[in-house]
Amino acid sequence: CEKPMAKNYAEAQKMVETAEKTGRVLNIGYQNRYRSDSLYLKEMCKADELGEIYFAKAHALRRRAVPTWGVFLNEEEQGGGPLIDIGTHALDLTLWMMDNYEVESVTGQTFRKLADQTNQGNAFGNWDPEEFCVEDSAFGFIRMKNGAVIELEAAWALNTLEVDEAKTSLCGTKAGADMKDGLRINYIHHNKQVVEKPALSGEGVAFFSGEEKPAGDYEQELFYHIVADGAEQIVKPAQAAVVTRVLEAIYESAKSGKTIYFD
């Protein structure tokens, strides 16, 4: 199933329940989990090398890259704009790294500030302002039940140079990590501040540079083995449903002006 798994949490829940009842494989297309930087950082998180992750940022910012094809600008068919399109990847990656899906509350705000402009400079060609029926940027603040917090930022069009997509920044008690300019790990060693940049592409030979396996290929191969051999899913349907629930809560909070509390 392509991301996001559904437009709202009720639909996502129904999908999870149906998969469980029928014994069918429900796999959600969060392929950014399979990138080499993501897999490396996940192993660090599993080994508790970052310690308790209590603050994180989920990044999905474009300066001017509004998708002008298909139904991306149609709220009824798409469900929303950049939040549900690319914000979903960043949030999924962040929650997965934290291994924390216990959400306490969500506060959010959406904006449609640049959609009516005709001087666009868009990477995918000019959009039609009259067809632009979704937000052009959205921001959320997510509080977890253990006290950890996540900031989510998503935009197709925003006057910023801090562009990042499907990236996460993590702050733990032992170390921190971000995906700016490659994967960077920061920590204190011998009373000094250290930044480590793992070589993830098989480097180390003067005449050869390793080639990274595309995340999409990894995802397809794993799906085959899940179906054919019973391999364990990396993207659990229940996890993807939580992502959908948080996105829906951000939209709801933006409309109501209130914080949305989870059960």
Where are these regions (language model features)?
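Contiguous beta-strand/loop segments that form the cofactor/metal-binding neighborhood of enzyme cores
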Residues: 92-186, 220-231
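Beta-strand-loop-alpha-helix segment that lines the small-molecule cofactor/substrate pocket
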Residues: 1-33, 48
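Hydrophobic residues in well-ordered beta-strands that form the structural core
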Residues: 1-2, 26-28, 57, 152, ...
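Active-site loop of classical SDR/Rossmann-like NAD(P)-dependent oxidoreductases
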Residues: 179, 208-220
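C-terminal helix-rich "cap/oligomerization" subdomain common to oxidoreductases
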Residues: 11-16, 21, 145, 195, ...
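Short, well-ordered coil/turn segments that N-cap beta-strands
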Residues: 22-25, 52-54, 136, 146-148
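Predominantly a Rossmann-like dinucleotide-binding segment in NAD(P)-dependent oxidoreductases
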Residues: 32-132, 257
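C-terminal "lid/loop" region of Rossmann-like NAD(P)-dependent oxidoreductases
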Residues: 197-211
